[in-house]
């Protein structure tokens, strides 16, 4: 934005703020839901972009640590909680319990939620910077890493992100309609998301129907012909990226049996003593499932199983093979790798051999990536993160970042919590040292709300979200589920404004 345009933007926000000054004074005197009646006019005002775990954890630390800070969370969807709502597997309700903590934060007197606001479109980051003392970008990773191989645009090939969004009710993925008429599915990637997808494909419907999986996904999975899932990785058993919890769930999944190549585990048992305890436990469980002779009870269970899963190691995708009509996926060609190096420096190197696997469903689980949100915000396209130092966006005073857009899409929710707390601490330290000036009066949400009103944008408050929450819970109860998620943004807004 030019200096002239930036100046006009600043004047516009200040005018809107002065026009609403009387309203602001009345609000401070009488108080409204979500605002503190004791917050002085010069208190620090912080805007957080993104209503997922990173945003809520950043807000939590700010309002708990400093008693005068006012925090506003802006989220593009009408519903909060981001990856907890749309990324956590339906059969992991215990992970979603963190929503209770986020709800407490959203109900805090000095924290407000503003859903249905698209930062970068409805309001720019520069406009937010004019309205707040600090802006924290916590909007996560909306993009997918692509395989970059021929055939990945064929029907029957999906990203894990889109597939997860489909069964978890992300509005943008509600029309995905994956074709599950094939017998074999191949998942590329061996992290927790890959195992979540495998588990959803193979889980008995009687288990899934008690979760908050969307009804359209449940109906599709009930009719699925998928009976075999291969989970493919480019490195070996000692580098598998999932955690022991997710692996144990696969091993114990009712109605399934593991099918793996014993040759891929040669020499692994001899390395156990040298492994760190978490990796050792994971590898022991993997070896038990792959090559140990099962006991009588386990053998009977496996013999009765109608579905199978297994890891395939040292394989890299070369091409998705098309059907005879060149429309659908009919298989995948894999390069066979070998490992070179030791320890953390081990790398996969192609041997020149290839292997073709017949399959009608290919799901790529090779990672998410963040995307730029606004031309005014620096972005490292190669690393797919906002360049930062301890959460401070480089060369941009008053702008911070937390979560995946800060460090990349890695780790579990606890990792994001610690990362977000770190950014909040950095911001508060800057206030304490005076490097972040909070002495001037900023309009905060009052100024932004005036801008949004002029542009015809109606934000969704947290109390509005609670109407959606109640209706989803009611619909779920009629089906014996925790909730039945709304899939259409228009319907969400209609319920919120009823």
Swiss-Prot record:
Transit peptide: 1-37
Gene3D superfamilies: FAD/NAD(P)-binding domain, NAD(P)-binding Rossmann-like Domain
SUPFAM superfamilies found in the cross-reference section: Nucleotide-binding domain
Location in or out of the cell: Mitochondrion inner membrane
Bilayer disposition of the protein: Peripheral membrane protein
EC number(s) reported in the record: 1.18.1.6
Entry keyword Repressor: no
Compositionally biased residues, Basic and acidic residues: 469-488
Gene Ontology molecular-function annotations: oxidoreductase activity
Catalytic activity entry: 2 reduced [adrenodoxin] + NADP(+) + H(+) = 2 oxidized [adrenodoxin] + NADPH
Chief place of localization: mitochondrion
Protein name: NADPH:adrenodoxin oxidoreductase, mitochondrial
Organism, as annotated: Salvelinus fontinalis (Brook trout)
Lineage, top ranks: Eukaryota, Metazoa, Chordata, Craniata, Vertebrata
């Amino acid at each position: 934005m030019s200096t002239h345009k930036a100046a006009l933007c600043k004047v516009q926000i200040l005018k809107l703020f002065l026009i609403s000054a009387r309203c602001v004074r009345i609000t401070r005197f009488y108080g409204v839901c979500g605002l503190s009646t004791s917050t002085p006019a010069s208190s620090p005002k912080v805007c957080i972009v993104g209503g997922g775990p990173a945003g809520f954890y950043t807000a939590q630390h700010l309002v708990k640590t400093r008693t005068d800070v006012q925090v506003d969370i802006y989220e593009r969807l009408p519903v909060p909680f981001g990856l907890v709502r749309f990324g956590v597997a339906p059969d992991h309700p215990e992970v979603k319990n963190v929503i209770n903590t986020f709800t407490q934060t959203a109900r805090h007197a000095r924290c407000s939620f503003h859903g249905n606001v698209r930062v970068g479109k409805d309001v720019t980051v520069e406009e937010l910077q004019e309205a707040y003392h600090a802006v924290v970008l916590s909007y996560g990773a909306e993009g997918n890493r692509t395989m970059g191989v021929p055939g990945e645009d064929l029907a029957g090939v999906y990203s894990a992100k889109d597939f997860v969004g489909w069964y978890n009710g992300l509005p943008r993925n509600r029309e995905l309609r994956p074709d599950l008429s094939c017998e074999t599915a191949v998942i590329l990637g061996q992290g927790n998301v890959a195992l979540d997808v495998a588990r959803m494909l193979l889980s008995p419907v009687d288990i899934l129907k008690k979760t908050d999986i969307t009804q359209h996904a449940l109906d599709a999975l009930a009719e699925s012909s998928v009976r075999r899932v291969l989970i493919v990785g480019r490195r070996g058993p000692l580098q598998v990226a999932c955690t022991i919890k997710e692996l144990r769930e696969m091993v114990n999944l009712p109605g399934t049996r593991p099918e793996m190549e014993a040759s891929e585990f040669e020499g692994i048992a001899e390395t156990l003593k040298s492994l760190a305890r978490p990796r050792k436990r994971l590898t022991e469980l993997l070896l038990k499932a792959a090559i140990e002779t099962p006991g009588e009870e386990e053998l009977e269970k496996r013999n009765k199983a109608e579905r199978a899963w297994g890891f395939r190691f040292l394989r890299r995708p070369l091409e998705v093979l098309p059907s005879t009509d060149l429309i659908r996926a009919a298989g995948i060609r894999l390069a066979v790798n070998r490992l070179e190096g030791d320890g953390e420096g081990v790398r996969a190197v192609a041997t020149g051999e290839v292997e073709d696997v017949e399959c009608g469903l290919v799901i790529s689980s090779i990672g998410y990536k963040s995307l730029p949100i606004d031309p005014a915000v620096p972005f490292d396209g190669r690393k797919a993160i906002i360049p930062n130092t301890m959460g401070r966006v480089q060369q941009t005073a008053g702008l911070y970042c937390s979560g995946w857009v800060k460090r990349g899409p890695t780790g579990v929710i606890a990792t994001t919590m610690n990362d977000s707390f770190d950014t909040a601490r950095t911001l508060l330290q800057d206030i304490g040292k005076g490097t972040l000036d909070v002495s001037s009066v900023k309009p905060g949400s009052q100024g932004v709300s005036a801008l949004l009103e002029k542009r015809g944008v109606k934000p969704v408050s947290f109390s509005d979200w609670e109407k959606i929450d109640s209706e989803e819970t009611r619909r779920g109860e009629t089906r014996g589920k925790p909730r039945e998620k709304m899939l259409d943004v228009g319907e969400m807004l209609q319920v919120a404004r009823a």
